[in-house]
Amino acid sequence: YIWANAGDGFIWIPAFALTLMYKKKFLPFLLATIVCSTIITQSSKQVFFKSENRPTAVISDNALIHKVSGIVLHTTNSFPSGHTATAFSLFLFCCFISAKKWIVPLGFIYALLGGYARIYVAQHFPLDVGAGILVAYCSILLSWVIHIHYFNK
């Protein structure tokens, strides 16, 4: 259950606080990452892929749906996975700003488990999760360009 919420938007709060305390110069990069990821994900879900159903709407035999207590099963706005985009955006952000090598495998496992959990709790298809990873990658690259161009003087 915890991993299913690994990419919840609230994860940005401790990321913001830690960046503010220890890596203040990267705050614009973090904010750009949050904004880019949110805009790309939500515009995709609400405008471009609005009719994309989730597994619960597609699989007619409810016995095949794995249910987890505490997880509300949604039926629409599946593509891309916003939780996965958030988890991978945070992971990639940490990779960019940290010199510590252990961040890469630990962060990758965190993000990957978050994406896998979205499939496990029947909230997304694997393609939705893959698209969430792509959103994160594009968001982090765009945010880095913005950061370098406007804030890294």
Q: PLM features: what roles do these ranges have?
A:
Residues I2-N5, L30-V35, G130-I133:
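Loop-to-helix transition at the N-terminal end of transmembrane alpha-helices
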Residues Y1-W12, Q42-H74:
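N-terminal transmembrane-helix/juxtamembrane module of multi-pass inner/ER membrane proteins
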Residues A4-K23, H83:
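Hydrophobic alpha-helical transmembrane segments
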Residues W3-A6, F10, L27-L30, W102-I109:
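Alpha-helical transmembrane segments
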Residues M21, N62-K153:
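Membrane-embedded catalytic cores of phosphoryl/pyrophosphoryl-handling enzymes
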Residues A32-F48, I103-A117:
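Small-polar-interrupted transmembrane alpha-helices in polytopic inner-membrane proteins
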